[in-house]
Swiss-Prot record:
Residue numbers binding dimethylallyl diphosphate: R104, K192, T193, Q232, K249, K258
Native species: Fusarium fujikuroi (Bakanae and foot rot disease fungus)
SUPFAM superfamilies on file: Terpenoid synthases
Encoding gene (name): FPPS
One record GO biological process: farnesyl diphosphate biosynthetic process
Binding positions for Mg(2+) 2 per the UniProt entry: D95, D99
Protein name: Farnesyl pyrophosphate synthase
EC supergroup of this enzyme: transferase
Cross-referenced PANTHER family: FARNESYL PYROPHOSPHATE SYNTHASE, FARNESYL-PYROPHOSPHATE SYNTHETASE
Amino acid sequence: MAQQTTLQEFNSVYPKLEEALLDHARSYKLPQEQLDWYKRSLEVNPLGGKCNRGMSVPDSVSLLLEKPLTEEQYFQAATLGWMTELLQAFFLVSDDIMDSSITRRGQPCWYRQEGVGMIAINDAFMLESAIYTLLKKYFRSHPAYFDLIESFHETTFQTELGQLCDLLTAPEDNVNLDNFSLEKYSFIVIYKTAYYSFYLPVALALHQLNLATPSNLKQAEDILIPLGEYFQIQDDYLDNFGKPEHIGKIGTDIKDNKCSWLVNQALAVATPEQRKILEENYGRKDDEKEKVVKKLYDDLNLEQRYLDYEEKVVGQIRERIANIDENDGLKKTVFEAFLAKIYKRSK
């Protein structure tokens, strides 16, 4: 019987990994002041999140094996999970600089913390390098070592492609709704979010257990990429229609000129008059203009459009899960667990 990991259990692995990373830096005789800086970055940036991506690795390994993990299996899976969290930290530190963000996880963004500034760019590079330090230390003799390295490299590049498309499509200081399209939106969410948040953790679990056949990876991708797209569309929906006390933040997609699912849906069905309203009010840092856009979303019945989309896409995902070929060790339960976590979520 598979066993779900807890955040406490997952967190308990991190100090050993942090020490391994600091030891690696010490091997180059890094001066103490810089070592302390690296330690602080490793304790601020990867920690403090929900760790959903990271915990998906041990959860998936346990579901694939259909039993609780041994200590060694758990350590390996959690280590791979922490590598996805380091990847996420690398992206977030960089994104926050690019977006001029103010806070992250309830604290000032890393680049806004005292004395950090643009040194954060180098810190982001070091967080990425940490992945490969840990891979070499703990997986050098693993049969899938090469595939694990390639998985991280490829997923990193895919995410950077999504980020590039996002930055060029929706700059905060230049509102041009002609840039937006559902095709661009789909590219952004698939590459910027779905690959590293949904596909990568399961691919890592399959590699850990030497079950990463081309067929298994393809089946996983065919389910997890649409699932990741659904997750992001849900996020966009909650940004406008969710309750701030549920989602833990006040939605800012309208003011931030985000190429979101809702604005693309609005553009697809708006009359010329309604489009003019969008062009005059979208992407402006103004409460009244935001209210005008929100009212337009209501007038266009976007909430119902989302609910119809949700039922359709979840039906398609369930059908794909039901058709999974389990002969090479893949398990339907892995995907059912992902879907159960996000279907009808309110935060």
